[in-house]
């Protein structure tokens, strides 16, 4: 069956980024839930799905309680490391800031998004649907019961539109 000549895409067309299976080197850790990786000769910003850490880098916003600790934890765990990225079938490919939305797995198989939550460095970000939502919410409940990280009583936390925010 012949479908006709191949179409040539105009030069301004961009190819959507699909994460090829494999590991990618983390080139920068911006904060607790955002990293950059080297992917196919370019740098891609990656926002971790389903987790929210206190802000340290948001323009015109104060540094939030627990933010520096979450950033430091992510830097210690991920700076220069190789990670495996996984998309979520029910979430978008990119967010409004053009960051890839991904689950980030460490070389040993640890799901870093969930680790941030279970260690109290972040909280489940449930504003948007994602496959591991129940798992992440349970990890957050366990961290809260154990008074870990942001749940240790130092930060005054409130929930706003599916996000837990610090008032301290």
Where are these regions (language model features)?
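Small beta-barrel nucleic-acid-binding modules, primarily SNase/OB-fold domains
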Residues: 1-168
């Amino acid at each position: 069956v012949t479908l006709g000549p191949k179409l040539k895409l105009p030069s301004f067309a961009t190819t959507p980024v699909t994460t090829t299976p494999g590991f990618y080197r983390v080139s920068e850790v911006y904060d607790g839930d955002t990293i950059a990786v080297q992917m196919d000769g370019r740098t891609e910003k990656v926002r971790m799905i389903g987790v929210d850490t206190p802000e340290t880098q948001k323009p015109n916003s104060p540094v939030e309680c627990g933010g520096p600790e979450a950033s430091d934890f992510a830097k210690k765990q991920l700076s220069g490391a190789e990670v495996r990225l996984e998309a979520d079938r029910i979430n978008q490919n990119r967010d409004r800031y053009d960051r890839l939305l991904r689950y980030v797995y460490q070389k040993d198989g640890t799901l870093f998004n969930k680790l941030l939550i279970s260690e109290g460095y972040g909280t489940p970000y449930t504003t948007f649907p994602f496959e591991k939502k129940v798992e992440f919410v349970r990890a957050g409940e366990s961290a809260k019961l154990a008074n870990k990280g942001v749940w240790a009583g130092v930060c005054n936390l409130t929930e706003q539109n599916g996000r837990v925010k610090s008032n301290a």
